């Protein structure tokens, strides 16, 4: 059998459409325009492209977009002072500091400085703790997108066996918490787990977020399982041309076994910005004491 392709382009477009409707309603009914501030330190080309995409999609959703660009050699104190200003700015409901930061800056201190109520990346330790405690929290965007995509295939994840390969603070750990909140049975694994293929073969849901190109092979997949590939890896093209993007899953092999699978590119990556905007709207509503939006 050939797996159903879970199309990130279509799903993210639908989500952004619903989001724009909710933003328009909040603006109309409550006079609140959600605002997202993005802080870019240095001039990393990939980060600049990502920030431009965020700005464009933020405006298209009807939100206010604020960009702050700082040189790579900015002192830590100056960066923290900017975050303090954004924390106090009533027009800003979401703050995202583009990672990774240049050498010499303490990422943990910067993340901790963002007001948890405006931490739309969901990385502040307060939000991580709230999520682990089953309380309302702004959640990292990529895990949020993974859940949305899994629910395109399964109306409920309750009782399903899920494996998360990868234990990062950005994806693996929060994804485990979200799956537990959905009443899935979760195994968390990583590159040093023993007999990882056997663990994968038991899973109805496979989430690969380990950062190793095509590590998860087709014969690791349980027939009919749903595979969500978070990896984005550049590998040399066999013909010497441009590098190609591949995931953490060997797509050509896995799609012959899985029931549904996300492609790379065109999968989870497209959901990340859409979920960032969802978090910004949720933050704006929470800050103003409004009901949780319907997205």
Curated annotation (Swiss-Prot):
Pathway: One-carbon metabolism; tetrahydrofolate interconversion. One of its GO terms (biological process) is tetrahydrofolate interconversion. The keyword Membrane does not apply. NADP(+) binds at residues 166-168, 191, 232. Its EC number is 1.5.1.5, 3.5.4.9. Keywords: Amino-acid biosynthesis, Histidine biosynthesis, Hydrolase, Methionine biosynthesis, Multifunctional enzyme, NADP, One-carbon metabolism, Oxidoreductase, Purine biosynthesis. It catalyses: (6R)-5,10-methylene-5,6,7,8-tetrahydrofolate + NADP(+) = (6R)-5,10-methenyltetrahydrofolate + NADPH; (6R)-5,10-methenyltetrahydrofolate + H2O = (6R)-10-formyltetrahydrofolate + H(+). SUPFAM superfamilies: Aminoacid dehydrogenase-like, N-terminal domain, NAD(P)-binding Rossmann-fold domains. InterPro entries: Aminoacid_DH-like_N_sf, NAD(P)-bd_dom_sf, THF_DH/CycHdrlase, THF_DH/CycHdrlase_cat_dom, THF_DH/CycHdrlase_CS, THF_DH/CycHdrlase_NAD-bd_dom. Pfam families: THF_DHG_CYH, THF_DHG_CYH_C. GO terms for molecular function: methenyltetrahydrofolate cyclohydrolase activity; methylenetetrahydrofolate dehydrogenase (NADP+) activity. One of its GO terms (cellular component) is cytosol. Catalyzes the oxidation of 5,10-methylenetetrahydrofolate to 5,10-methenyltetrahydrofolate and then the hydrolysis of 5,10-methenyltetrahydrofolate to 10-formyltetrahydrofolate. PANTHER family: C-1-TETRAHYDROFOLATE SYNTHASE, CYTOPLASMIC, C-1-TETRAHYDROFOLATE SYNTHASE, CYTOPLASMIC-RELATED. Belongs to the tetrahydrofolate dehydrogenase/cyclohydrolase family. HAMAP family: THF_DHG_CYH. Homodimer. This is Bifunctional protein FolD. The gene is folD.
């Amino acid at each position: 059998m050939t797996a159903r392709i879970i199309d990130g382009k279509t799903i993210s477009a639908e989500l952004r459409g619903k989001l724009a409707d909710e933003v328009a309603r909040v603006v109309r009914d409550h006079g609140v325009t959600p605002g997202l501030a993005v802080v870019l330190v240095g001039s990393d080309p990939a980060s600049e492209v990502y920030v431009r995409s965020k700005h464009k999609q933020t405006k298209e959703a009807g939100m206010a977009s604020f960009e702050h660009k700082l040189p790579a050699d900015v002192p830590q104190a100056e960066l923290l002072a900017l975050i303090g200003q954004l924390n106090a700015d009533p027009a800003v409901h979401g703050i995202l500091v583009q990672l990774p930061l240049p050498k010499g800056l303490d990422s943990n201190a910067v993340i901790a400085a963002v007001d948890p109520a405006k931490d739309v990346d969901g990385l502040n330790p307060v939000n991580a703790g709230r999520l682990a405690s089953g309380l309302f929290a702004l959640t990292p965007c990529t895990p949020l997108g993974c859940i949305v995509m899994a629910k395109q295939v399964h109306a409920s994840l309750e009782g399903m066996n899920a494996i998360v390969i990868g234990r990062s603070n950005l994806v693996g750990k929060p994804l485990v918490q979200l799956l537990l909140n959905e009443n899935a049975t979760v195994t968390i694994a990583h590159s040093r787990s023993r007999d990882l293929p056997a663990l994968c073969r038991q899973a109805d849901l496979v989430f690969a977020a380990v950062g190793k190109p095509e590590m998860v092979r087709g014969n690791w997949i349980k027939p009919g399982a749903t595979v969500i590939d978070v990896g984005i890896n550049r590998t040399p093209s066999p013909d010497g041309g441009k590098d190609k993007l591949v995931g953490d899953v060997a797509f050509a092999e896995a799609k012959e076994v899985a029931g549904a699978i996300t492609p790379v590119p065109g999968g989870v990556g497209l959901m990340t910005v859409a979920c960032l905007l969802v978090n910004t709207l949720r933050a704006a509503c929470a800050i103003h004491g409004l009901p949780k939006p319907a997205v």
